[in-house]
Amino acid sequence: MGTNGGVIAEQSMEIETNENPDKVEEPVVRRKRVTRRRHRRIHSKNNCLTPPNSDDDPQMSTPDDPVIHSPPSIGAAPGMNGYHGSGVKLEESSGACGSPDDGLLDSSEESRRRQKTCRVCGDHATGYNFNVITCESCKAFFRRNALRPKEFKCPYSEDCEINSVSRRFCQKCRLRKCFTVGMKKEWILNEEQLRRRKNSRLNNTGTCNKRSQPGNQQSPQGPNQQPHLSPHHPGVAIYPPQPQRPLTINPMDNQMMHHMQANRPNAMPQLISPPGAQPYPLTSPVGSSASDSPPNRSLTMMHNGEKSPDGYDPNIMAHRAPPPSFNNRPKMDSGQVVLSTEEYKQLLSRIPGAQVPGLMNEEEPINKRAAYNCNGHPMPAETTPPYSAPMSDMSLSRHNSTSSGTEKNHMTHSTVSAIPGNSAQNHFDIASFGMGIVTATGGGDAAEEMYKRMNMFYENCIQSALDSPENQEPKPQEAMIPKEEYMTPTHGFQYQSDPYQVPPAERNINYQLNAAELKALDAVREAFYGMDDPMEQGRQMQSFLKANKTPADIMNIMDVTMRRFVKVAKGVPAFREVSQEGKFSLLKGGMIEMLTVRGVTRYDASTNSFKTPTIKGQNVSVNVDDMFAKLNANAQAQKAKCLEFFGFFDEEIKKNELAVYLVMLAVLFSVRSDPPMNENDVRIVTERHNHFMSLLNRYLESLFGEQARRIFERIPKALGLLNEIARNAGMLFMGTVRSGEAEELPGEFFKIK
């Protein structure tokens, strides 16, 4: 019967296919789907023990998954599965235990889902990096170079095609494309942020590992339920764990609280395990067994969990140590004794953040090495034992003798030293205090008296060590504080009314540029973009290519640079705020000065010539001696001043075009008197001049650190010489160029007749 039914079904499919040619592929597709689903149903029954409701479980995903999720396919949409909704559940539930053929289908679908291309180079993308889908190579390239002040140069046509092969050949075009597609350099983390993220991930990983251990499986407890108590020793008092308090540099508060708890009757010390998660019941060390104790770790008495990672109390071994030997020490009139140099170094080494000096004078720090003595007894000369704990982990050690859990705690008497003038019954050992072995005797108000004396010791000895110059902690770095507004009094680099009065450089300053300063530098680069674009035609190009250049050719070459300076000025937002008369005054007074500053980057001292990349594929140079020799009689004095001006700039500045751009903008935005500028223009120009000078100072600091002060202090003298050069340059071409031989724009600045 089943066989006949199958034959009839096949015949009906053939008839339907012959009648409807458009549905030729549909029976084949349905037959494949039915076969695949039958195979999956049989395979899941034989090999999988999946609960019936497991099909509804959502797929797990993590935020660190680098896969770029694409929209669901059409086949997975409701109503497009061919049959009923149960078919969809069969496909979903077969992901974990499907056949090899199903794995191939799933892997092919997964590979199609993963096929995303990098927006920069077109390579295989791994995820969203800095706001754009990119590959790992472009992600690393952008992180390394987006915040660098270094200016890349394109070795080709400034318009390179970036793909997976050519991306290595041109860094400038690759970085420009990164910004073009929308990558944001503000999303790059600095070293401090990377360190915090790494620590956070390590903490999360450690927490997950502890929770995943078999011993950590505990039954859930309500908020008001008490932790599990061992039935072996019901008389042992177990206290719930307390939240850890932040560590402070003064340990007296922790000492006082712990000592006050020690004087309470019927109180047992809290027994806890080392810091971290506590997956084991808290019981007495005597009655705990292997099943309820952590492996290879013994329960110890620790105050608030502030102990060494090894999980032992250093003071336990201190009680077994032999009594310390005493040596004679030099005494002071105030009843103090002087610590030895080695002991003083050890004391400083226990202060968080303190630096032990390598060489120490025996007489200079005598007031710091002085400590109180008890009735003339000298201080112990023992060095720090191997079991001593750091000063930040000091705790009061006690010997408790309890028979039934109801007797009071009896504290053993130990050798101690007291401040002169106080009773010898209530005292503490200063030397032991420095080694983390503080013991106390007495009761009642003894704790308060001891607390006062400990504070006095802290003020007299430890605080003086902290206040010493070699132990001062560095001040907060202002440059690392994020700022919201640019050019405000709270900004990273200060807006100075007189930028030439540079304050003395402070030590331990982070000279890294912040986001606002980097944005301002990007605006400067954008304004000068295209300054070195190659020429292709025109009379100026013929002047560039001549081997023997005339004064008219020199003016035509300067015409190209002058026109590009005008384009740069129009690209500066502050220049557009100036009135039309003010713009003319700025360009007329600053054009020759900007040409001279431009010569700083083009002058080659080895060949004594100016070199320019304006002509593509041509090495164009103009010899300085030949150029000034063809001008009038005043040219030689002008040449000497120009060479002197070039000498004010270091070689690092001459090679850094961005620094020279900032100098050129500061020269452009200078108050001019021909023609006179109105009051509003003077205000705008003055603010912009100070702005670019302050930005230049910060940029130099980011490159040279403390050496930037020496470089920046030479700029005012260089600008003074620049003004003198510009005043005497107008007559250089007088009588050497005929009318019509040169372009008109240079004739506005240089007189030819």
UniProtKB/Swiss-Prot annotation:
Gene3D superfamilies: Erythroid Transcription Factor GATA-1, subunit A, Retinoid X Receptor. It is found in: Nucleus. It comes from the Eukaryota. Residues 20-29 have a biased composition (Basic and acidic residues). SUPFAM superfamilies: Glucocorticoid receptor-like (DNA-binding domain), Nuclear receptor ligand-binding domain. Residues 516-753 form the NR LBD domain. Changing residue 196 to K: Small reduction in DNA binding in vitro. Changing residue 121 to Y: In sa156; no transcriptional activity in vitro. Defective dauer formation. Residues 201-211, 285-301, 394-410 have a biased composition (Polar residues). A zinc finger (NR C4-type) spans 118-138, 154-173. One of its GO terms (molecular function) is DNA-binding transcription factor activity. Disruption phenotype: Reduced lifespan associated with accelerated aging and increased tissue deterioration. Defective dauer formation. In the absence of cholesterol, arrest with abnormal cuticle formation. Increased resistance to P.aeruginosa infection possibly due to elevated expression of antimicrobial genes. Prevents increase in the number of muscle arm extension in a daf-2 (e1375) background. RNAi-mediated knockdown results in reduced lifespan, but increased resistance to bacterial infection. Keywords: Developmental protein, DNA-binding, Metal-binding, Nucleus, Receptor, Transcription, Transcription regulation, Zinc, Zinc-finger. Residues 30-44 have a biased composition (Basic residues). Residues 1-109, 198-251, 266-314, 376-410 are annotated as: Disordered. A motif (Nuclear localization signal) lies at residues 191-206. One of its GO terms (biological process) is chemotaxis. Expressed throughout muscles of the pharynx. Expressed in epidermal seam cells, the vulva, head neurons, mature spermatheca, uterus and intestine. Interacts with din-1 isoform d. Belongs to the nuclear hormone receptor family. Nuclear receptor which binds directly to response elements in target gene promoters. Activity is modulated by binding of steroid hormone ligands that include dafachronic acids. Regulates expression of genes involved in postembryonic development and the dauer diapause, in response to environmental cues. Inhibits the expression of let-7 family members when bound to corepressor din-1s which is an isoform of din-1. Plays a role in controlling the timing of seam cell development during the larval stages. Has a role in the immune response to bacterial infection, via regulation of let-7 miRNAs. This is Nuclear hormone receptor family member daf-12. It comes from Caenorhabditis elegans.
